[in-house]
Amino acid sequence: LKVQGAYLAPDYVVGETEAAEWGEKIKTTTVPWIELRGKQIAFSVPVKYMKLKLQSEGQSFVTRLEQSLELWDDWVLCYNEFYGLDDAESETFPKPDFPVRVVMDAHLVTERYSYYSNTNLELLQTEELIDMIADPEQVKAGALNTSHVVGWMSLGLFVQTYWPTPAPNSFKDMYSL
């Protein structure tokens, strides 16, 4: 397989990416999207917002971004532990070996700021939600309820209960409590 005319997107990876070098790559990249990746979560975001944040906030944005991604990892680990996915019984009930995926989009099906399925979360493509992803203080405060939505996504993925299709959602929700 031969690939031509492609190059590696300047993704930000917690614990691996050097901040100053990443900032320079973002300023010059022509790719439209990148990933902001922790160990447990990955955000697919438009590069235009990263350029905007680096221009207005400089390297302090990158420092806060690193802290935020670490906090997001902690959120996901908390949900994993709540559902018994803490690697205590890695043979019988292993923790997922894939990150929670969060993708920004210009228009969501729900007409709200977020939408989730059992495997990924979609966020409305806005600067406000970039701040929610990249500001450690907002992550600590619940991240505009997005951390809660990650929990609902985990519930659908990890609850080991079968429901017949016609079962009312209100009944399923009451049982889950």
What are the residue ranges of the model-derived segments?
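Extended acidic/polar, glycine-enriched regions
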Residues: 1-30, 35
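Catalytic cores of extracellular degradative/oxidative enzymes
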Residues: 22-23, 32-177
